[in-house]
Swiss-Prot record:
Gene Ontology CC: cytoplasm
Residues noted as binding S-adenosyl-L-methionine in the record, renumbered to the chain: 196-197, 228, 250-252, 327
Lineage, highest ranks first: Bacteria, Pseudomonadati, Pseudomonadota, Alphaproteobacteria, Rhodobacterales
Catalytically driven reaction(s): adenosine(2503) in 23S rRNA + 2 reduced [2Fe-2S]-[ferredoxin] + 2 S-adenosyl-L-methionine = 2-methyladenosine(2503) in 23S rRNA + 5'-deoxyadenosine + L-methionine + 2 oxidized [2Fe-2S]-[ferredoxin] + S-adenosyl-L-homocysteine; adenosine(37) in tRNA + 2 reduced [2Fe-2S]-[ferredoxin] + 2 S-adenosyl-L-methionine = 2-methyladenosine(37) in tRNA + 5'-deoxyadenosine + L-methionine + 2 oxidized [2Fe-2S]-[ferredoxin] + S-adenosyl-L-homocysteine
Protein name (Swiss-Prot/TrEMBL): Dual-specificity RNA methyltransferase RlmN
Length: 394
């Protein structure tokens, strides 16, 4: 199958229709979409551009959720907006804080579906791990999240809404007499490494990230946004052209035989095809390098030979290799490589001239670590459902 073949998923998802008589959500609309919506609502043509700028700043620079708080708009115009539109973000169902400061939010979106969002504080940055789909279609054998079937894609509003609720919790919207732009940002980076494959939901992810990068709003540099893909080859060049963010690749193996088992998408776009697509990305996107993510699995992909083969495979690609200790989960078919084995693997890569940081697991005590998202929640709810069925209370 060629690298330009149409992309398909196990589950076909369709955009959700607006309920009869429902209001359109302004969160997630691009500037052109917002202009079109305001014009259709009766905004005079000569005022549309000005109104877009005003509303955009209220939504994404100040975090306002009530049209009545948009004080530089006339009251009749605020009433018109409130009559036809809403400002809606995902509902926070639960919030857990790890011993290491990691925060995990379970959020509910349209249709009653739930996804998880993780905030990871560090000394020099604060990173938000964002989801792009409900469930996942990739079935990577080492990832617990991948055992959960794909339900649907998230909308651009549901994706950017995750950023907004995290800023709510962190208190990072302006208050009278305070300008957060003059302060160290608590939420400074975004990684599209939550539930789902971002490149299987390209348009919504692109629009959400464009909103996050807009200098008149959330204003995050594209260098502070990293999109992680398992290797959807046909969309990689498009990502460079239309988003231009940093790119991470879930690589995890140095032979097709092993990667076919760990990351089944490799059966469609193998290692050679993937690497060919990646070689042009740093130049096309004006990004410094590509991050190769490599989960360390005992006796599977952690030998010295694997390390040397990895270095040979990526030769010529500006890159760093993130080594990820496997986050074990009940029933997992793999074990974490020993610390000594991981360090030896990292040393081979480092001596070949590549940065090879070993990721420190974060949020394990609240099931917020890599590959664990939503798993504990689903297990708990399944258990409650089983109990209810057994007792006749379901």
């Amino acid at each position: 199958m060629s690298a330009t073949s149409p992309i398909t998923q196990d589950v076909v998802t369709f955009p959700r229709k607006l309920p009869e008589g429902g209001k359109r959500n302004l969160v997630g609309l691009t500037r052109p979409e917002l202009a079109e919506a305001l014009a259709a609502a009766g905004t005079p043509e000569k005022q549309v551009k000005m109104r877009v700028n005003q509303i955009w700043q209220w939504l994404y620079e100040r975090g306002v959720r009530d049209f009545n708080d948009m004080t530089n708009l006339a009251k009749p115009y605020r009433a018109l907006l409130a009559d036809q539109f809403e400002i809606a973000v995902p509902e926070v169902v639960s919030r857990h804080v790890s011993e290491d400061g990691t925060r995990k939010y379970l959020v509910r979106i349209a249709g009653g579906h739930e996804v998880e969002v993780v905030y990871i504080p560090e000394e020099d940055r604060g990173t938000l791990c964002v989801s792009s789909q409900v469930g996942c279609t990739l079935t990577c054998s080492f990832c617990h999240t991948g055992t959960q079937k794909l339900v649907r894609n998230l909308t651009a509003g549901e994706i950017v809404g995750q950023i907004m609720i995290a800023r709510d919790d962190l208190g990072e919207w302006p208050l009278p007499g305070r300008n957060p732009k003059n302060e160290t940002r608590l939420l400074s980076n975004i990684v599209l490494m939550g539930m789902g494959e971002p490149l299987y939901n390209f348009e919504a992810v692109r629009d959400a990230m464009k909103i996050a990068m807009d200098p008149e709003g959330i204003s995050l540099s594209r260098r502070r946004i990293t999109l992680s893909t398992s290797g959807v080859v046909p969309e990689i060049a498009r990502t460079a052209e239309e988003i231009g963010c940093m790119l991470a690749v879930s690589f995890h193996a140095t032979t097709d035989e092993v990667r076919d088992k760990l990351v089944p998408i490799n059966k469609r776009w193998n290692i050679a095809t993937l690497l060919d697509a990646l070689r042009d990305y740093p130049k096309a996107s004006n990004s410094e390098r590509i991050t190769f993510e490599y989960v360390m699995l005992k006796g599977v992909n952690d030998s010295d030979e694997d390390a040397r083969r990895l270095v040979e495979l990526i030769k010529g690609i500006p890159a760093k290799i993130n080594l990820i200790p496997f986050n074990e989960w009940p029933g997992a078919p793999y074990e974490r490589s020993s610390n000594n084995r991981i360090r030896a693997f990292a040393d081979i890569i480092y001596k070949a001239g590549y940065a090879s940081p070993i990721r420190t697991p974060r949020g394990e005590d609240i099931m917020a670590a890599c590959g664990q998202l939503k798993s504990a929640t689903e297990r708990a709810r399944k258990s409650r459902a089983q109990i209810a069925a057994e007792t006749g209370l379901g």
